[in-house]
Amino acid sequence: MTSTGIRLHAPAPGWAIAADVVVVGSGVAGLTAALRCESAGLRTVVVTKARLDDGSTRWAQGGVAAALGEGDTPEQHLDDTLVAGAGLCDQDAVRILVTEGPDAVRRLIATGAHFDESTEGGLALTREGGHHRRRIAHAGGDATGAEISRALVEAVRARGLRTVENALVLDLLTDAEGRTAGVTLHVMGEGQHDGVGAVHAPAVVLATGGMGQVFSATTNPSVSTGDGVALALRAGAEVSDLEFVQFHPTVLFLGSDAEGQQPLVSEAVRGEGAHLVDADGVRFMQGRHELAELAPRDIVAKAITRRMQEHGADHMYLDARHFGRTMWEHRFPTILAACRAHGIDPVTEPVPVAPAAHYASGGVRTDAHGRTTVPGLYACGEVACTGVHGANRLASNSLLEGLVYAERIAADIAAAHTAGTLHARVPAPLPHPDHSQHPRHPLLPPEARLTIQRIMTEGAGVLRSADSLARAADRLHGLHAEAREALHEHGKTSEPGVDTWEATNLLCVARVLVAAAARREETRGCHWREDHADRDDTTWRRHVVVRLNPDRTLAVHTTDTPEFPPTVHGAQPTHRPQEQ
């Protein structure tokens, strides 16, 4: 693949670091990859957008799923994952996940993560939506992500890995042959490095997390603006399955006008026996699915949305009053505190909940070793699309995917280094085409962020149709056209900065999401088309893949099968440009 030539308008790098590998992101995927690369003797640099312990991992409540319990097997975990994925999982990718997962969790424990234990002394395992067995290991009751983050951050600091915090990655650097040569980044604030710089490395691992901030209401932190997906698109990489955005069924409802990050009410609350009820106290999941409240997330989110439509309501309720105070305080202290902070006491009253954007099942298309279609560029965690999640991620498979595929990436880079194919001398990067005072590509103003979020929530949220998606595409195109006209006709664009770079990245990923959702004319997993209400395996048991063209149009195509072929050296299909 060749780069699009599109870059974020930014000053020229004023400093540079050399490394063997640069890992972008400090969640479970990024720090696991970094620790394994460092252990293999690779000079490793970690770049992260905020502090090392920020990002989505620390917000994960439920836990990490793996076949660790008595009587459970990887095959059973595989079956549950395939069912949740609604016919679009790559079975080989899932088999890797479930067979390598248990040992990956054990290595995480050896790194220093402390999981809750049962009274018998083994791991305390709970059950969540879509799982037929108790196989979710958790920590601190409902603070699993925070504990995993703590353990990994401590390990990174103990080993003295070089880290660059408060740094927004801008673009991929490549050499004349199109090989990865590092990244450009902007460090916020003053420190050892500040302003725009570069990390030169022959291998780049994207572990930048999700893009939930493309919607008005999300469980994702404010830093989740799709930076990794946007960078990969500009670098010429393929993105797959971006239409499959998982809306978590039970997010604390803070009012119809609430925007930004909102508190998650973990699946594990339902796993322990909480009931979904309407305003009349009627349970509405019984009879809709054999697992009732523990059905896969897409089914529960749709059921809540339908009930809201039927009742003209903007939320439903999660009733766990029967847990009692002691269970709430010991098993779900984080959720209890979040509810009480907003004036709700789940011990004595039902909790108002509604679906909100939670997880991108799609992302940068990779093979089984995390390799993208750009040589030397890897991706893992939520930013990646490995084929594991299909059309809908199974609860608590995300942390496991981050662990397993990060280790596979590190092994692949280490093997290339040992074989001498990871070129020892960092190639000289090509001159950045957008460093001049006269940028070629516009930046959106900061206020465009809210506009994009509202466009996406209205047109590409839980419920979608050809009309809603067409309106969203037109409005997104209008934002870009307005910025492009201001630049080309008047020589004006927004000043380079974190707010304008984030808004521009959000527009990039929003356009791709809408294009993919419009192309998939069926309902499957967490993609719900009102105008195509049925699942169509004959036509649509395949992936929607998108590339960014140099003229900023989108090349959209579908694969022939649900399986993921090798990404780096495969034959390229013919693409049909599509202006969005």
UniProtKB/Swiss-Prot annotation:
Pfam families: FAD_binding_2 (PF00890), Succ_DH_flav_C (PF02910). InterPro entries: FAD-dep_OxRdtase_2_FAD-bd (IPR003953), FAD/NAD-bd_sf (IPR036188), Fum_R/Succ_DH_flav-like_C_sf (IPR037099), Fum_Rdtase/Succ_DH_flav-like_C (IPR015939), NadB (IPR005288), Succ_DH/fumarate_Rdtase_cat_sf (IPR027477). It is found in: Cytoplasm. GO terms for molecular function: L-aspartate oxidase activity; nucleotide binding; steroid dehydrogenase activity, acting on the CH-CH group of donors. The record marks E128 as: Important in orienting the L-aspartate substrate. It comes from the Bacteria. Residues 556-580 are annotated as: Disordered. The active site is at R297. Pathway: Cofactor biosynthesis; NAD(+) biosynthesis; iminoaspartate from L-aspartate (oxidase route): step 1/1. Belongs to the FAD-dependent oxidoreductase 2 family. NadB subfamily. This is L-aspartate oxidase. It comes from Streptomyces coelicolor (strain ATCC BAA-471 / A3(2) / M145). The gene is nadB.
